[in-house]
Amino acid sequence: MTVEEFIKQNAEQIKTYPLALQALWHDYQENWHQSHSLIDTAGDKDSAWVHAYLHRKEGDIGNARYWYRRSGKPESRLSLSRERQEIARVLIQEITN
């Protein structure tokens, strides 16, 4: 599945995906709050990566740095749209392999 195909999924289809991908899908639908609420208490590294991106998007860089550390990923220097696309690509690849 491509990122473009992922974005076009509907809300019912994404419920079968890991929490991090569900949260990212909601961000693609421009629903930051739903995205954040899905991963706010998640403890896995993929969710922490999405959480970092969301706080970076929000402008809360200190909190974003905390979540990048939790995710084991370096702090992104990409544009927000490119970072989101890269996260989506990696997470989609994890479920399709």
State where each predicted segment sits.
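Inward-facing hydrophobic residues that define packing positions of alpha-helical scaffold repeats
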Residues: 20, 32, 39-40, 68, ...
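TPR/TPR-like (Sel1-like) alpha-helical repeat modules
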Residues: 43-45, 57-79
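Residue-level signature for tetratricopeptide repeat
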Residues: 21-25, 53-55
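TPR/TPR-like alpha-solenoid helical repeat scaffolds
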Residues: 9-10, 52-61, 77-97
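Generic helix N-cap/helix-start motif at coil->alpha-helix transitions
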Residues: 13-19, 43-48
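A conserved position within tetratricopeptide repeats
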Residues: 10, 36-39, 43, 72, ...
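Repeat-mediated protein-protein interaction surfaces in helical alpha-solenoids
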Residues: 1-11, 24-37, 89-90
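Acidic, aromatic-enriched beta-alpha/helix-loop junctions
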Residues: 39, 45, 49-56
